[in-house]
């Protein structure tokens, strides 16, 4: 960094005085000048880095992007997880959809109408310990690009898992690159045949996740697992105003 004339002089407001022909100033003003000079030097060093960084673009979190989030809870279930193992959350098979837990907690109607476009799809997992005062963390592993004919194991060994995010909640993006989701009659398909809604509507255009969940505990733990699909939809402007009158 070169010589800067603006760093030569200190700026004092009522902090200096002259006693016995000696120029005095308060120690606080000296410390303030030091901090001010350090800030100027730091800004001068950061400016060239900022100019270079402005030439590049970075991606933001797509979950916080434009659009409206619509959540559909698939099921809630209490499962026992053995130590050093991970249990499959959902295998998306036909027999699993007929269980009582799916029909009890499932949404009665599909909240996305035909005039709304699906921009993105997320698999949301919420984990809760069933016993109080338990000190352990939730672990997780998942696969997206699995073969449709692959039969997933119900229980696997923990091998290099990662910890579930804050609030014991994790979201997985299921979008495939280069595939646009068509506008179809989603509401009628969802209400008529729930199983075909996944096999014929979602999985041809989105990844089918295989998610395993475990704990760091050395004992058998009971965990409440809540699975939901979170749709990011694009809302189109209506053709006519929703309200009429002098105030609108």
From Swiss-Prot:
Q: Which organism is it from?
A: Xestia c-nigrum granulosis virus
Q: Which Pfam family, an example, fits this chain?
A: Polyhedrin
Keyword line: Viral occlusion body
The UniProt entry, under InterPro entries, shows: Polyhedrin
Q: What is the lineage of its organism?
A: Viruses, Viruses incertae sedis, Naldaviricetes, Lefavirales, Baculoviridae
Q: Which family does it belong to?
A: Belongs to the polyhedrin family.
Q: Is Iron among this UniProt entry's keywords?
A: no
The entry's function note states:
Component of the virus occlusion bodies, which are large proteinaceous structures, that protect the virus from the outside environment for extended periods until they are ingested by insect larvae.
GO MF term set: structural molecule activity
Q: Which residues form a coiled coil?
A: none
Q: What is this protein called?
A: Granulin
Q: Does the keyword Chaperone apply?
A: no
Task: Name one cellular component (GO) term.
Answer: viral occlusion body
